[in-house]
Structure formats: C-alpha cells, structure tokens
C-alpha cells in the first residue's frame, strides 16, 4: 500500500544521485514564483536528519515543501559547519530505523549498500554495564552504524529526489509570521542579505539545539514554554581510526559504561565500526572526569580512566585517521510545548529543537524519525490545515520524546550538579529497579530482550513492569557474571590482541 510520503520518490545511493543534484537544487532555489498557494506550502526550518525526514513526511501532503537551511548542503557525504556533532559517534536504534524506513522505503538498504553497518543487538555488542559484562544474546533488535555524513547524505538524496521538495541553502531564519492563533509563514535572510517572508500553511521547526522557537512564540504574544535541563557536565572526545586489516568487517560494537552507583565522575567509551573499515571512537566523562582534547592523551584515557582497558588496547593497534574532536554540548534540555495553554495553528517543533539528549544514549536520531512519522500520520488522518492539527501533533510527539527523555535523565540526574534539586524520590525508586533489571539482564536473555525493547525505542517502558519481568528481577540473573569481555578468540586475533 502506498503511503503519502513514498509517492514521487526514487531510491539510489548518494553516489548515484550526486550527479545533477546540485543543478536540481539550484533550480528549486531560484524558482520561488508561480507555485501553489501558501495554504498547501510547508516550510521546514533545518535541513539535518529530522528536518529532511519532516520534509519527506509532508511531501505527499503538501504541493510544495521548502527546507530552509543556514548551511549550504553538500551533494555528497561531507562535513558542514552547522553539524559539528557529526564528528562523534552516532547510532540509529531499530525503533528509529523502522520509522525512517516507513517514510523512505528502501533507505536502510541504500545505507548498507553504501557501507553502513546493521549490527544485531546484543549479538554484535560487547558491553560492560555497571553490573558486569552482558552476554551476547541472540538478536532482539538492531542498530544502524554509519558516519553522520553518510547517514545525512543518504537521507537527503532520497528526500530531494522528490521534485516537491526544495532547499533554500545559506538562509537564516529570522522569525515567524502570524499571531498567537496561527503561524502564517517565516521571515528569512538569504545569502545575499535580502530579507523576505515565505508564506506557508505549515511550518516545522527542526533547527536543533539552537532553536529560536521560545523567543518566536513570545514575539507572537504567547507565554514562554516550560523548560527542564539535566546537565551531567559530560564532555565528549572522539577520534576516527582505520581498524586493523582483519578487523575491518564484522567487528562488534564495544561499549564500556560508567557505574553511576559509584562516587565521583562517570567515564565511558564507545567503539563503533562504520563504513570503509573505520572505527569511530568516542570517550566521555562527567565533571571532574572529562577526557582531554589532546591527541596524545586519547589512548591513555581509554586504557587508564575507563573501567576496563579494552577500547584503549584496541585503538592502540589501529591507525588514527583524524585528530580529536571535543565538545561539551551534551546537556539534556526539553521544552514542554505540549503543556502550553495555547498553541498556534500551522506550527510544529520536532527533533533537538523540542528535546535534546545527552548523546551517549544514542536516541536523538531515532526520536527525530519517529516524530516525523507522527507528523505524517496525523496530518494524513486529520487533514491538511484542520483545526487543532498542530496541537495534536505536538502532544503526540511528546510520547517518543518522553520515552527517550526518561532513559537519559533517569541516569544523568544522579551526577553532582546535574539538576537544580537533584534526584527525586521517584527518580531513586525507578533507578533502583532499573539497576536490578540491568543486573538481571547480565545473566537472563529474556530480561535482556525486555530491556532492549525499551532502549531501542520499539516498546514503552511499561513492558518492564509486566509480572514476569518483576518476578525475574526478584530472582536475579540465571547465569554467573562474566569476568572477561565476551570476544571470541577469532575476534581477538583479528584485532591483533592475541
């Protein structure tokens, strides 16, 4: 059955679509006259992952979708100024993969054909939790692993293959037009300094952490939104490596997690195998335990500061392909727009503009995809321009947003100074139960699957309160705790550790 977003799109790899894409984009940017009335025009602010998926969501419903982007978007996988986080590790959990595939059928295959890795969870994961090493249970879910540049270019190519979608690159958003009752368009400044208004029947803010929506709403006469922040003080340091030759294909994810029960800062690390035989390695630490931005301290931190030296041992045998990229932009921040007493028609906020998470949990990409799918489905169900549609969408996207928010802040709130008042009694009770579940999951495959049901964003946290899960948590793990990383002898040999 066709969906509103899949009609008029074509598939193909970024390399296949690169030729001619710049010409198509240029024609779209130049031709802004003689188009449909504003009532059937959608404007998406931001051309990153969530913005492009929102454009795909609306392409089958609007006559024209205009993506307004501050950067000039590349026609192939390449860095850009407005996405510094692309230098760090990213993963797309299966809950987000399914949503993205619904919006852009076949895009997962296009990604894997271009070199992205589909890693089964927890089969291809070597994870040290606070309670010990997880076993590598049979596949329950999966993650897509790829450099952010490849992921974005693949999605962008698919979306822009639809002639109803156009990009205004090098364009700054100045504000919204309309009033407290309804948004009617956006004011922009183009690359030549010219300011103008784009009238629209729907506006989506997907501009990320730097979103101007709180200010734009007050400019329209609406109250400031409720906001909550949980800041663990996490600092991120990432570096790209070429894996040893025999470990360039099929090597597992490596994750050394912090123990939030221990006093002092938390330190952790990820090693993600991505395209072209590379490993992207991200090390992080909370206040007082931050990694250094210095290249020559990267391996030392991984070996000596994490709870196990495995990542440091692995990268000491790999070839560095980049210097260290460093950031402190990791605060959890959520705007509760769904709670506002009034909400303007024709306006929706998605992605990091709505809620930004500590990236260590890897949920931002998945939530963006799920939210774009909600936008498509509700617009299709209730009809373009229907009364109350934007408020319905804003309330509905709070569901996937809230699931990821609870997962992130439920851990981070325990670090010193993370929130104004510290963890609540509820936070402590939930954390104690989750800790017991994680302990049980080290030696119980069924409970490990229930946990990954939630972390993959495929099911809600209520599944963890089922009677069978409660009983299993009371019993604890059925197998003894592993004392060493569950790498096979062959994997150790391929990584030159044996």
Positions of PLM-derived features:
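Extreme N-terminal leader/targeting segments of oxidoreductases
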Residues: 1-42, 60-62, 73
């Amino acid at each position: 059955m066709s969906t509103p977003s899949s009609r008029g799109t074509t598939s193909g790899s970024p390399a296949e679509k690169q030729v001619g894409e710049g010409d198509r984009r240029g024609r779209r940017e130049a031709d802004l006259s003689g188009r449909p009335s504003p009532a059937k025009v959608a404007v998406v602010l931001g051309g990153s992952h969530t913005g492009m998926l929102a454009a795909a969501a609306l392409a089958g419903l609007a006559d024209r979708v205009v993506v307004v982007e501050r950067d000039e978007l590349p026609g192939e996988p390449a860095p850009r100024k407005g996405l510094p986080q692309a230098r760090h590790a990213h993963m797309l959990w299966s809950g987000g993969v399914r949503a993205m595939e619904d919006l852009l059928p076949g895009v997962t295959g296009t990604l894997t054909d271009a070199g992205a890795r589909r890693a089964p969870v927890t089969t291809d994961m070597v994870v040290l939790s606070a309670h010990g090493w997880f076993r590598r249970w049979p596949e329950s879910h999966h993650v897509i692993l790829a450099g952010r540049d490849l992921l974005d270019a693949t999605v962008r190519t698919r979306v822009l293959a639809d002639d109803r979608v156009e990009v205004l690159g090098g364009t700054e958003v100045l504000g919204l037009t309309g009033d407290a009752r309804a948004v009617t368009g956006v004011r922009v400044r183009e690359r030549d300094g010219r300011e103008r208004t784009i009238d629209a029947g729907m506006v989506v803010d997907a501009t990320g952490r730097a979103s101007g929506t709180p200010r734009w709403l007050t400019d329209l006469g609406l109250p400031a939104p409720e906001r909550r922040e949980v800041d663990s003080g996490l600092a991120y340091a990432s570096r790209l490596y070429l894996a040893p030759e025999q470990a360039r294909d099929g090597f597992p994810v490596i994750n050394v997690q912090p123990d939030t029960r221990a006093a002092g800062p938390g330190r952790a690390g990820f090693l993600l195998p991505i395209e072209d035989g590379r490993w992207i390695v991200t090390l992080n630490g909370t206040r007082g335990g931050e990694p250094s931005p210095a290249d020559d301290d990267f391996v030392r931190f991984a070996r000596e500061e994490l709870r196990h030296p495995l990542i440091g041992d692995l990268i000491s045998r790999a070839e560095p392909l980049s210097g260290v990229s460093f950031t402190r932009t990791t605060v959890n921040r959520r705007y509760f727009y769904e709670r506002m007493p009034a909400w303007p028609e024709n306006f929706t906020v998605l992605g990091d503009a709505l809620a930004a998470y500590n990236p260590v949990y890897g949920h931002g990409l998945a939530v963006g995809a799920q939210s774009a799918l909600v936008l498509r489905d509700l617009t299709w169900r209730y009809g373009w321009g229907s009364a109350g549609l934007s408020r319905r969408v804003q309330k509905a996207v709070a569901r996937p947003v809230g699931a990821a928010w609870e997962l992130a802040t439920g851990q981070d709130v325990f670090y010193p100074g993370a929130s104004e008042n510290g963890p609540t009694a509820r936070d402590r009770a939930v954390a104690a139960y989750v800790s017991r579940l994680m302990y049980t999951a080290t030696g119980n495959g069924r409970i490990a699957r229930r946990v990954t049901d939630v972390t993959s964003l495929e099911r809600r946290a209520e599944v963890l309160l089922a009677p069978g899960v409660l009983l299993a948590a009371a019993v604890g793990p059925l197998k003894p705790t592993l004392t060493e990383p569950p790498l096979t002898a062959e994997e150790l040999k391929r990584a030159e550790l044996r």
